[in-house]
């Protein structure tokens, strides 16, 4: 059973597997995910993710939230995507980590995402942007918890906030999460991607 979330607003939600101590099963089948607001900034997301891992001891971490889509992208407003790569925008190349999911999210189009400090940064090959993804992945990697990210597109990058379709994006996200919790629960340990840090960032082995 998925706990009801009190509004999506602009705050991503980290959905967590049940505490490890209660089950040694590799997936989430038969377990109740926990959900927490992860905040609307890199610092808030990092703190919330770390706190959730300490409190819940999850098998998996799934970050869910809204995103803006860059004009050249084929991703539509209202669509939900699985983030295939999360980049830290604005850092010098030598410091620019790239993060990739460490378990599979089935059934969604994938997209490359920029983690930005402000909206409107150059896409540099990314299709969507958000603020929290890289911080979330960095904490998950440091603590050794498999992690993935999904985003519902609420706006085109550069649009004023007044025209963002936040409610529509949150509804689409809630529908997908209800399906994903069951599907992710059937993922076997053989389907998990190894968690490691490399010169290109954190991601697939």
PLM features: residue spans?
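Short, intrinsically disordered C-terminal tails of secreted or membrane-associated proteins
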Residues: 200-203
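Glycine-rich phosphate- or other oxyanion-binding loops that anchor nucleotides, phosphorylated ligands
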Residues: 27-194
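Serine residues within intrinsically disordered or low-complexity segments
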Residues: 6, 23-24, 186-189, 198
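N-terminal beta1-alpha1 ligand-phosphate binding loop
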Residues: 1-27
């Amino acid at each position: 059973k998925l706990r009801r979330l009190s509004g999506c607003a602009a705050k991503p939600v980290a959905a967590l597997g049940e505490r490890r101590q209660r089950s040694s099963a590799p997936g989430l089948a038969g377990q109740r995910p926990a959900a927490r607001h992860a905040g609307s900034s890199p610092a808030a997301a990092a703190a919330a993710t770390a706190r959730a891992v300490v409190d819940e001891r999850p098998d998996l971490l799934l970050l869910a939230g809204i995103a803006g889509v860059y004009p050249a992208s084929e991703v539509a407003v209202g669509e939900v995507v699985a983030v295939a790569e999360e980049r830290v925008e604005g850092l010098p190349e030598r410091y620019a980590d790239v993060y990739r999911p460490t378990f599979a999210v089935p059934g969604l189009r994938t997209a490359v995402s920029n983690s930005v400090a402000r909206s409107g940064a150059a896409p540099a090959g990314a299709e969507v942007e958000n603020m929290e993804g890289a911080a979330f992945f960095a904490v998950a990697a440091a603590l050794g918890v498999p992690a993935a990210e999904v985003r519902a597109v609420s706006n085109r990058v550069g649009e004023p906030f007044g025209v963002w379709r936040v409610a529509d994006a949150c509804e689409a996200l809630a529908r997908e999460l209800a399906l994903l919790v069951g599907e992710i629960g059937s993922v076997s340990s053989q389907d998990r991607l190894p968690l490691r840090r490399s010169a290109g960032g954190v991601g697939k082995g």
